[in-house]
């Protein structure tokens, strides 16, 4: 049976700060808000954050990537992000030296690496 969608859960430091960042800065709509858990609609699946409390470690080594339709869209998103209160903007969009994508990276308030990318043919 084929799943109808997918959701990936990440622990977060502060659910309200995370919710504000992903809605106000990145513009992702909330799909479900369950108090200590919030799901964001990414258009092709869901990204969720959970406040497990202070004893739960955050995930490490992950990159949350959002695919855009074109390299021009990546450039436009970079211009938007550059003007906003983002954390750890890691440079302008470029072709990745190892993978066939055009992208840029930055961090969310939890320290997770975020990427906007366009896969290249």
What is each residue range found by the language model?
Residues 17-18, 71-77:
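Short, conserved charged micro-motifs
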């Amino acid at each position: 049976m084929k799943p109808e969608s997918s959701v990936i859960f990440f622990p977060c430091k502060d659910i309200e700060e995370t919710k504000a960042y992903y809605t106000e800065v990145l513009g992702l709509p909330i799909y479900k808000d369950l108090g200590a858990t919030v799901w964001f609609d990414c258009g092709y699946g869901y990204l969720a954050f959970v406040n497990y409390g202070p004893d739960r470690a955050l995930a490490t080594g992950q990159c949350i990537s959002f695919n855009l339709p074109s390299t021009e869209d990546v450039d436009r998103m970079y211009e938007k992000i550059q003007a906003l209160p983002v954390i750890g903007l890691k440079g302008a969009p470029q072709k990745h030296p190892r993978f066939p994508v055009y992208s840029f990276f930055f961090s969310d308030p939890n320290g997770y690496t975020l990427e906007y990318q366009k896969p290249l043919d």
